[in-house]
């Protein structure tokens, strides 16, 4: 079932019915209490928009090696430059998630894409380190596109299929690889300005035009779901989930450790390989960095599919256990080949882990998917900033990267403990629920394998 326009509610025999506005023939009526049937058109357009948003977000990771060459920036300066994008993405993710819950994904995603066009066209005039710092910060909005799309897609799919649908949507992580490869190819092959810092700036309006076209496609070819479970809720009721108990923060931390691998590595790996292992700048941007993003992206649908079918916490504990080992191997810095093995192994595992964590959000918090997704995405993006800065400080103060990667290994140890012990996942949490309504933070005392078990627990109350 597809919808080409927004819907409006009416009352029929005491039930809330949604009638599609603007339809010329065959008006569509939808029982607001029914399970959503899925919407492939919204899924795939959201996937494309998310991919483009992440491509814009990943631009400065690809530019970093060239900026070192053209402007003689230090490795620390470039690491900070690459880190401000995930920092700003973290800052805007929470409000964007709340706005998506309140106003719908179609409107918010369109406005997000339009907001990206402004700094992209202004990129033609950036000069000096601080102007690039401001530009990179504003382009960080692209990193928040996950939050909006995640809430929009999940509202169209039943809980039994949300893991798979959100895993497919999350393939948009590959946008970082698209951005890094596209930027490098445009600079080295199309614009041919590897030794000149003027012509390469055309990459900004090229991405700006693509983003503007995507905004138009999103507005005219997607619609908001009439099945949303939080209709009529105020912003205060939506954000109350942040006070609902420890569960929301545990889920957020797990996303910090899983999705944070992508934001951390995408920001730091090109510069790290260039500085520590003397990798070629073009190779670092066109091969090493995009490949790690591809590794994250390709395992997300598989992780979502497995999370639909097996106990999610057991699955996550095994993933994080292996990630701890690989993070320690990476901290040892034995050789370039060993580092690449650890990097790509972590990328594959973190993609599956992130999909499993995302699956938990609509199961535990069906009425505040946007708000909780925003918090989780903010944590994942903040991890990219925090760990990249930690790596830069480690290099500056200690002369190497070992301490920074050791800190990262400890983050994975904490995630492994949380999922193995299931601490905090056995107690119900109801503070976020408005008066007179059923609880949203679903408690399942020993098994969170499927949404059906979660719904059964809720019904039993």
What are these regions (language model features)?
Residues 188, 208-229, 415-423:
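C-terminal membrane-cytosol helix-exit motif in multi-pass small-molecule transporters
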Residues 60-61, 246-297:
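Extracytoplasmic gate region of multi-pass secondary transporters
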Residues 91-129:
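Conserved MFS/SLC helix-loop-helix module at the cytosolic interface between two early adjacent transmembrane helices
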């Amino acid at each position: 079932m597809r919808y080409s326009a927004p819907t409006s509610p009416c009352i029929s025999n005491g039930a809330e019915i949604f009638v599609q506005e603007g339809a010329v023939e065959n008006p569509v009526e939808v029982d607001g209490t029914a399970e959503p049937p899925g919407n492939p058109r919204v899924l795939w357009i959201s996937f494309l928009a998310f991919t483009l948003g992440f491509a814009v977000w990943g631009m400065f990771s690809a530019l970093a090696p060239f900026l070192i060459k053209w402007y003689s920036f230090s490795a620390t300066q470039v690491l900070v430059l690459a880190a401000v994008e995930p920092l700003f993405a973290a800052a805007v993710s929470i409000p964007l998630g709340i706005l998506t819950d309140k106003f719908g994904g179609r409107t918010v995603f369109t406005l997000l894409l339009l907001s990206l066009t402004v700094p992209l066209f202004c990129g033609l005039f950036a000069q000096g380190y601080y102007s690039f710092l401001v530009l990179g910060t504003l382009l960080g909005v692209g990193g928040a596109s996950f939050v909006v799309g995640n809430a929009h897609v999940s509202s169209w799919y039943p809980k039994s299929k949300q893991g798979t649908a959100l895993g497919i949507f999350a393939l948009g992580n590959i946008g970082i690889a698209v951005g890094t490869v596209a930027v490098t190819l445009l600079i080295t092959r199309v614009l041919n300005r590897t030794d000149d810092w003027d012509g390469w700036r055309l990459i900004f309006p090229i991405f700006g035009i693509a983003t503007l076209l995507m905004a138009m496609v999103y507005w005219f070819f997607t619609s908001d779901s009439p099945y949303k479970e939080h209709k009529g809720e105020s912003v205060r009721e939506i954000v109350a989930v942040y006070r609902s108990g420890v569960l929301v923060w545990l889920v957020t931390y797990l996303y910090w450790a899983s999705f944070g691998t992508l934001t951390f590595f995408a920001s730091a790996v090109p510069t790290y390989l260039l500085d520590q292992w003397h990798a070629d700048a073009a190779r670092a941007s066109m091969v090493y960095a995009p490949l790690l993003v591809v590794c994250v992206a390709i395992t997300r649908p598989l992780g979502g599919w497995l999370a639909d079918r097996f106990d999610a916490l057991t699955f996550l504990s095994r993933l994080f256990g292996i990630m701890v080992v690989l993070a320690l191997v990476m901290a040892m810095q034995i050789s370039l080949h060993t580092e690449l093995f650890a990097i790509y192994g972590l990328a594959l595992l973190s993609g599956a882990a992130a999909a499993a964590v995302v699956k938990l959000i609509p199961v535990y918090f069906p009425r505040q998917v946007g708000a909780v997704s925003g918090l989780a995405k903010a944590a994942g993006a903040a991890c990219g900033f925090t760990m990249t800065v930690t790596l830069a400080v480690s290099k500056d103060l200690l002369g190497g990267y070992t301490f920074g990667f050791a800190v990262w290994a400890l983050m994975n140890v904490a995630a492994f403990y949380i999922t193995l012990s299931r601490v905090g996942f056995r107690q119900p949490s109801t503070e976020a629920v408005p008066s007179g309504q059923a609880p949203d933070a679903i408690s399942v005392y020993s098994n969170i394998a499927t949404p059906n078990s979660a719904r059964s627990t809720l019904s039993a109350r």
